């Protein structure tokens, strides 16, 4: 590892990541007038963001940085291409890793893997349906669209908030910080779907000021020191049904989504591999036919 990379990793270990993230969160939520506008325009230039994709193309339309960062895209630019027998990509981003969950372990990077059970909050019963299943880890860069959508129809079964650290989740950190996605703060959503159980894990990171869902609003902050979970009815008027392509959550500043599926439920698109660019709505996987 290059000396500069070692320095970057060292500073991640020692800097007050939660404090920095919350301070940035306060700024991102503030209506700071000309300063907010200046920062938004700098961000657009720095990360080469194509504002023609946004419903509100003008930076002036956004009164806070958070409003800009969670901007909605024109629906016609992210059509739902996945058919009834396919799963759609949930986000714009890039594949970090994907493949089989082996003996309850998920591959992170060369020399590093982590526990499925830890990722989902430590409950063995929550992890059991996904043992020997499939996973996909997708990294959202600062330039990306930061709303998360459903890869298939689903009914929300459980949500879990897992407190943790706030390391960066960029490729350098993923390659050098063990257990990264199972040690960072995260929100786990477990669904019953047409392909069986599915989890969507929204992983926090340095300067991620907020993680939210469409059914509960902002989950974090505030943060807590203990795991919290909420169970939901899967039938009746109170059940939370979300359709394929429908929004399920968002990040205020970028991070990572980890998806898990049961054994023999899906087969990923052959073209997908680490660093593959993903676009919400495009085909991610095929639903495997049941042997029944």
UniProtKB/Swiss-Prot annotation:
Keywords: Cell membrane, Decarboxylase, Lipid biosynthesis, Lipid metabolism, Lyase, Membrane, Phospholipid biosynthesis, Phospholipid metabolism, Pyruvate, Zymogen. The modification Pyruvic acid (Ser) is found at residue 255. InterPro entries: PS_Dcarbxylase, PSD-B, PSD_type1_pro. The keyword Membrane applies. It catalyses: a 1,2-diacyl-sn-glycero-3-phospho-L-serine + H(+) = a 1,2-diacyl-sn-glycero-3-phosphoethanolamine + CO2. It is a peripheral membrane protein. Is synthesized initially as an inactive proenzyme. Formation of the active enzyme involves a self-maturation process in which the active site pyruvoyl group is generated from an internal serine residue via an autocatalytic post-translational modification. Two non-identical subunits are generated from the proenzyme in this reaction, and the pyruvate is formed at the N-terminus of the alpha chain, which is derived from the carboxyl end of the proenzyme. It is found in: Cell membrane. Pathway: Phospholipid metabolism; phosphatidylethanolamine biosynthesis; phosphatidylethanolamine from CDP-diacylglycerol: step 2/2. Its cofactor is pyruvate. The active site is at 92 (charge relay system), 149 (charge relay system), 255 (charge relay system), 255 (schiff-base intermediate with substrate). GO terms for biological process: phosphatidylethanolamine biosynthetic process. GO terms for molecular function: phosphatidylserine decarboxylase activity. Its main location: membrane. The keyword Cell membrane applies. GO terms for cellular component: plasma membrane. It holds the Pfam family PS_Dcarbxylase. Catalyzes the formation of phosphatidylethanolamine (PtdEtn) from phosphatidylserine (PtdSer). This is Phosphatidylserine decarboxylase proenzyme. It comes from Idiomarina loihiensis (strain ATCC BAA-735 / DSM 15497 / L2-TR).
């Amino acid at each position: 590892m290059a000396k500069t990379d070692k320095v970057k990793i060292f500073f991640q270990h020692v800097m007050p990541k939660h404090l920095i993230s919350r301070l940035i969160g306060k700024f991102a939520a503030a209506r700071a007038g000309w300063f907010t506008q200046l920062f938004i325009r700098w961000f657009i230039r720095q990360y080469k963001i194509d504002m023609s994709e946004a419903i509100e193309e003008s930076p002036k339309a956004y009164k806070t940085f958070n409003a800009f960062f969670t901007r909605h895209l024109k629906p016609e630019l992210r059509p739902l291409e996945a058919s009834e027998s396919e799963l759609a990509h949930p986000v714009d981003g890039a594949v970090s890793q994907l493949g089989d969950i082996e003996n309850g372990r998920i591959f992170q990077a060369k020399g590093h893997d982590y526990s499925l059970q830890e990722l989902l909050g430590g409950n063995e019963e929550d992890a059991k349906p996904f043992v020997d299943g499939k996973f996909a880890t997708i990294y959202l860069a600062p330039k990306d669209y930061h709303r998360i959508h459903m890869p298939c129809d689903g009914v929300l079964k459980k949500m879990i908030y897992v407190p943790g650290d706030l390391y960066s989740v960029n490729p350098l950190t993923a390659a050098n910080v063990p257990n990264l996605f199972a040690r960072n703060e995260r929100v786990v959503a477990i669904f019953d779907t047409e392909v069986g159980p599915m989890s969507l894990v929204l992983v926090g990171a340095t300067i991620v000021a907020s993680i939210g869902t469409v059914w509960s609003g902002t989950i974090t902050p505030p943060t807590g020191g203990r795991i919290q979970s909420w169970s939901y009815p899967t039938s009746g008027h109170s059940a939370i049904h979300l359709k394929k392509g429908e929004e399920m959550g968002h990040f205020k500043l970028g991070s990572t989504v980890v998806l898990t599926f049961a054994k023999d439920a899906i087969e990923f698109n052959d073209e997908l591999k680490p660093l593959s660019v993903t676009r919400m709505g495009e085909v991610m996987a095929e639903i495997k036919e049941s042997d029944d």
